[in-house]
Regions:
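Karyopherin-beta/Importin-beta family HEAT-repeat alpha-solenoid scaffold
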Residues: 1-422
Length: 422
């Protein structure tokens, strides 16, 4: 069996050399990333046996990570794996080795903030590959990135030292926000880092269904929302698109902790942002409204139900269907899911526009029948039809019969042409 000192020699004794490709890691970088992954397993599974080596390995990994340029994609896996190892140490019995003020300051300055920076390849995905960007940024994907590992490192450090970590790291949040305020158009990336850092400091527990469920008591989420998030929503479209997306994502994350009286201002702003020419912003705006409509009170009643939603219903439909009509968003699952959610929550308050809504849905079905698209999008289209019929049946069964007449020819065509098997 290969000994632990052997691995140490491989980490500390080899010069960091990348491959010829500037974007992809060479063999040596891959090996070092794998070694860091193995070290993480040692710390997690065999902490007692590994205890004599933790200090040396931690120093070796630290030296390795801090001389890497995190802006280069080829180092992403190594940075992520290395920070995972430090995260595991921060959670275990050796956590005191990372708890000193100087250590925390160095970690924040040299690892966390640099690895939370918006990189060139992030900008490319944001503009040219929005699906990939959203999958990595908004959804609970299993993608391992240096940015996600930096956030996990912050959360790991909080486990045994929450008050001190929060105090030290929060000072950097303030510095970043002050830098942004001095020149928003040029320093937008500083606020982007601040958004990610405050989230890593604040979130203590979360679920996919509810978003954040518990928070760090030392982080004033309400104050940050009012001072830094709501102001960005109101500044649209005169602020940077990445900051627009960050603000909407923050609301998605902390939706269960926001009071009902904040929802109208959020929804009003988000409706406008659905029309953004930037696909990520339009998608986040739709996701923001949709997820707010899923928030429940302790008694399971909706925090923002049909009556509260009514003033916004038709503006939401106008914005969502209008954006779906554009070629770049015609198969956007977030917009379609929003339409489905509003139909479900509105409880029949769409009667006056129901025929127009059904016409829009039928037109979409006719289009996707010819060229099936994203499965989730197709699913939400048919769910929307079902919601519309269901919510109106008790009020006007004759209207549902009209809907059947509108949609049956299309459905018959699907069966006759055996579209599903093509």
């Amino acid at each position: 069996m290969i000994s632990v000192p052997f691995w140490y020699g491989k980490v500390a004794g080899t010069d960091l050399v990348g491959g010829q490709d500037e974007d992809k890691p060479g063999i040596l970088l891959k090996v070092k990333a794998d070694i860091c992954q193995n070290l993480t397993v040692y710390v997690e599974k065999y902490e007692e046996e590994f205890q004599p080596f933790i200090g040396e390995f931690m120093k070796a990994v630290w030296n390795l990570l801090t001389k890497i340029d995190p802006s280069q994609p080829k180092y992403d896996s190594l940075l992520a794996r290395g920070m995972q190892m430090l995260t595991m140490i921060s959670k275990g019995v050796a956590h005191e080795q990372l708890s000193a003020k100087d250590s925390l300051t160095q970690i924040c300055e040299r690892l966390v903030i640099p690895n939370m920076r918006f990189r060139d390849n992030d900008e490319i995905n944001f503009e040219e590959n929005p699906t990939e960007y959203i999958r990595a940024d908004l959804e609970d994907s299993n993608l391992l990135t240096s940015r996600s590992s930096a956030a996990q490192l912050v959360q790991g450090l909080r486990r045994h030292n929450e008050a001190n970590v929060t105090q030290i790291f929060a000072s950097y949040v303030m510095n970043l926000l002050n830098s942004y305020a001095s020149n928003p158009s040029e320093k937008w990336s500083d606020k982007d880092v601040a958004f990610h850092l405050i989230s890593a400091l604040a979130i203590s527990g979360s679920t996919r269904m509810e978003g954040t469920t518990s928070v760090n008591e030392h982080v004033p989420i309400g104050e940050f929302f009012n001072g830094q998030v709501l102001t960005e929503l109101k500044a649209y479209p005169n602020n940077h698109a990445v900051i627009q997306a960050d603000s909407l994502k923050f609301i998605c994350s902390f939706r269960s902790l926001l009071p009902a009286n904040a929802f109208p201002s959020i929804i009003e702003a988000a409706v406008k942002m659905i029309s953004s020419p930037v696909i990520v912003v339009a998608s986040y705006a739709a996701a923001c409204i949709e997820r707010l409509l899923t928030v429940k009170e302790a008694n399971r009643s909706p925090r923002f139900g049909a009556e509260a939603l009514e003033p916004f219903i038709f503006s939401i439909f106008t914005a969502a269907f209008g954006r779906l009509a554009k070629a770049d968003c015609q198969n956007n699952e977030y917009l379609m899911r929003l339409i489905m959610r509003v139909l479900d929550v509105s409880k029949g308050r769409v009667a006056s526009a129901s025929q127009q809504i059904m016409s829009e849905l039928v037109a979409i079905i006719e289009r996707i029948v010819k060229a099936p698209t994203i499965p989730a999008f197709d699913h939400y289209v048919f769910e929307s039809v079902a919601c519309l019929c269901s919510c109106l049946y008790d009020k006007d069964p004759a209207m549902v019969a009209q809907f059947e007449a509108m949609i049956l020819p299309t459905m018959t065509g699907i069966l006759q042409n055996d579209t599903a098997s093509k």
